Structure formats: C-alpha cells, structure tokens
C-alpha cells in the first residue's frame, strides 16, 4: 500500500475531517487539487483568493473560500500585532501582513480556525515559511523530509530543503524530527544512518567529525535507539547489505537503512533528485517538521498530484 493510501485510511478512521487551508486559490494547479480533495471527502480544503476576480468561473461553492479584498481583517491584524509587537512590529505592519494570502493562512492556523496549511506553488519558500515561523512557533529546529517511494519500498531523506549547513546539534535534531515522523507513519522497523563520505572512521576531516558528533549527540539523548541508528556511513554501506558487511562488519543490520540523514543541504537536495530522476523513486514532500502546527511548503513545480498528496500528509499530521 502506498504511503498516501495509508494516510488516507488513517485520516478517515480518525472520525474528524481536518481543515487544511490552501492560500493560493489563483493557481489552477492548486484549485484542481482542492477540487479533488473536496470530492474525496477526506479533509476540508478552504482556499484564499486575493481578489474577487481571481475566483474562477464555475467555482464549487461547497468549498469554503476567503476573498481578502472583501474581508474585515481587523481581528487578524490585532492578533498578529499582539503576537509580534515585542519584536517591534507596528499595527500598520500587522495590517499589511494579513493582506498577504500566505500570511493570512498562517494567522488562521495560529487562531485554530483551520488545522493546517499547504502553500508554496506560487510563493518562494522564504515567503511561505516566514509567516509560519513567526506565528506558529517551533518545537525545536525546523527541518524537512522527503518520503522516497518505489513499489513497496519507502525511504526517508532528510534534510533536502531547509537546513543549509546544520551544526552537529542541529543535525541531531534534524534526525530526531525525521525519526519521530517515520515512527508516526507506522513503519514496522526503522534503521537510520547519518551519511558521510566516511564509513566508521575510513575517512578523516571536519565534515566527518561533524557527522560523528551529530550521531553521538543523538544517541546520548536517545540511548534506547542505539540498535536503530548508525553513523557515520557512506550511502553504499547503508543501502547495500553486501557492501556493509565488508565496510562495517560489526553492524548486524539486515537489508537497507530506511532513514538517511544527509550532512548538509547540498548533499540532501542533490541526493533526493538523483534518486527521483535516475532511480525512479517518487519524491513526496518536502514535509516540514519541527513547527508547532502542521504546515507544508510546496515546490513551485508541484503537480496537481503533488498538491493533493501534500494535502493528505498535512491532514495526517493533525492527528495526535
């Protein structure tokens, strides 16, 4: 069963339709995905338009929608001002803030008027993530994960979208965020590796030291996971059992690791795209981890299927 089918079942069995807002109603791709989500009946997908003219002809009126130019935004501006005035925000800035669709969506999430947000088809990542960070808060360090799926195989690649050059401490949190997320997906067995160009001391250098340190920090915090976590490993050692038996004979895992923690954004972003384009894996994500509330950022190249899938994932993230 695919991860999306699994999550559909999980959301439906919860007995409550999560409300996931899509603040880019002027995007035809987003609107097609929203229509499909509405028809599927798994979640409630309200949308935001900036102007009445953006509402498409034949719009499905069963879908709740917000038109910013027609709204009284006073309540939302007051909320943002109270939330951000300690950072120097003035009321006029708060009023401008909530006239932006992405920022208004984050405000609605923060006020519990909706359960989560999916944005990024029309916005750059920095413009979707900034209001979410300002209003939703973080559990620790914000990172992301891609679910890489091919046939019955499911892998988790992190961080391929946000953490540019994480410190050892930050890399340990990236790993923690992803391990917890993979657990929430109901995986029967998790094997996580911290990737490097070195396998257990075969290489030297500052980059290796960082990965070794991150592994140690993670295991000091989670000693109960020692049998599930290893670092530093090269990718072939982590993925191919025959290679691992040669390079790391004391590591007794069977099969491949299924969580791959990349040392920096260069490696992670390149790695997931190679797996996607050359390896034939479907890349689902990036899924944002570490925020206090469910929020996910789309690629601007996202297809209707991508938007639909991220909507389902975000709905699943609302479940406790």
From Swiss-Prot:
Coiled coil: none
Signal peptide: none
Reactions accelerated catalytically: acetyl-CoA + phosphate = acetyl phosphate + CoA
EC number(s) per entry: 2.3.1.8
Pathway: Metabolic intermediate biosynthesis; acetyl-CoA biosynthesis; acetyl-CoA from acetate: step 2/2
Source organism superkingdom: Bacteria
Presence of keyword Cytoplasm: yes
UniProt keyword list: Acyltransferase, Cytoplasm, Transferase
Molecular function per GO: phosphate acetyltransferase activity
Cell compartment(s), UniProt: Cytoplasm
GO cellular component annotations of the record: cytoplasm
First-level EC class: transferase
Biological processes, Gene Ontology terms: acetyl-CoA biosynthetic process
Regions crossing the membrane: none
Membership in a protein family: Belongs to the phosphate acetyltransferase and butyryltransferase family.
Alphabetized NCBIfam families for the sequence: PRK09653.1, pta
Listed name of the protein: Phosphate acetyltransferase
